[in-house]
């Protein structure tokens, strides 16, 4: 097979090695636009896991890399005069130029031809080839030539960074967070060779502008940063090598192959340098592509197999890198954190490293974090917390007004569609009661509608008829009598998403018969097939507001501990907040302040009735749709809601419009809770694809939320909290009839 590889970086050279080694009959040529002896940058980072992957693919390359690498276990975080050191991380640093030289040497020894100063713009420029590999980096000319097929998307991030070196040999992967008159600077530093370290400096655009630095003034940059980091450099110099100020591009492509052309490495995807994964991804791409090509399938089929196998892992790492880069872009919001919590937050910023992962690496640090968090929880709740043993974060108390939860796990509202004219029944008793027995600190009812016309379906729960109070009281009294859990009720009006069938009979489809009229902020149907709502008049607003107040009064009579008002997911109050669903021309439309006017009126009215007990509000922090609510809007919505009388914000996202395109993934909504909690400075609950105790503990210890809300996990396992306690070695006593469970040892089925 004739293979043309465009780009003599780690991706292209390593692929050439693997292809030529596995089949010496392949004719493999590598084209490089620059001179082969040129090189830029300083060191690159590999985890031990990556080194092991490389070792399995080509032991000879791995041996050469290991001999050239510097190794370290520790991470140091310098923040507000404090230094936190974490161990057990196992990294290696290699000089980039050395890496390229050893890869090129290995490739040539196998018979690969490497040609420098050859700019390849189109596949035809390579000459006859059965396979063309575009490994020509972020600014790939081949990718751009075939952009209509690859569908590239480049997201240029906001922070500025410069890649420098230094003669100071850092003994650990070191992060500085350095304030200056211009603003806050972040530094990523690590050793890659004796007496040589990478020194990446990053700052917000406004900080960089205030410093007076210029993009391409290397000498000015070095002089400024040597002065700024004089103490940290300990008399050592900074080194420049094409060290210009840049912004990082996150590269994604709709597809990675077209005909006999395939994207590899940075041409296909990038991951922010804060997770140290660019070269890792490049070399692992090469391993995956070589494996696919070895199958003997026709090239187009092999390329499709490569993309199918490789894309999920890459996209997962890109999500982690996105979380990490957004953390570094927003470090300013964490400046008030305790240095220990700041360090924990930084170490877990990508959402891939959890409380449990970190405990296995560095048990002493996590024990210190847990002890600190337990003390904080005791102070916040006014309840003593035993430190022998120290409880995991999820098993610490939390106070909302006079309500004290015994732990931080919340059963999320989950519609059951089993009520009759709003009356809940035995199904709801078992559903809520079993989760309360299961150990959660707070159980919240399904969306409970404040009027008959406010239901999603005929099977929705209600709080609008006198008889509803007794039906709900039966459940509330059971929870209070038999468990330590508290119970809240979520009050709502479905708005334009009402009068539909249960999801299993047709999601969002109108009823076949018996539809009722709908209300919304504006007369816009949720789907073209849905009923068009009537735009609410002031009289409608009064009636619905009073229905919320009446439902709050009835909830008090039923004995609920907390009310959650539903301002999310495209239901009635949500339609006022989102610009996508609010097209009003009066004082309730237009600016966010105007759009919030009616939801805030409802919050204030419910607060006046509910008086001393806590109120939560569930919001959609973003709409996941162009022109809709963005993350900064979510911060303001939360701030206004708490100012109007809410005590905590249950942070969700989306659901507002049918055309939304959520970016799903593990903990996908937690970053919104994190931002709201620190920028609006309000308590938050986070929800969305949280499944493990490790994730929940991480969220809490890092300060990303105050309570952790789980839905599907509680459907799968009503006793999720008790099983988490067992997993973590924490003793959570069972109710007396179940006390024998303490002596039971579960075994794999």
Give names to the regions the model predicted.
Residues 1-4, 8-72, 78, 87-98, ...:
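Glycine-rich FAD cofactor-binding loop and adjacent beta-loop-alpha segment at the N-terminus
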Residues 8-21, 133-134, 244-323, 327:
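Conserved mid-domain beta->alpha element of the FAD-binding
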Residues 29, 261-263, 443, 708:
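Residue-level marker for buried hydrophobic side chains located in beta-strands
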Residues 48-163, 365-375:
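Conserved N-terminal helical subregion
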Residues 105, 128-248, 252-253:
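Conserved FAD-binding catalytic core of PHBH/FMO-like flavoproteins
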Residues 135-137, 271-272, 414, 712:
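Glycine-rich, N-terminal phosphate-binding loop of Rossmann-like dinucleotide-binding domains
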Residues 291-382:
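C-terminal helical "tail/cap" subdomain of flavin- and related membrane-associated enzymes
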Residues 368-749:
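Flavin-dependent oxidoreductase catalytic cores
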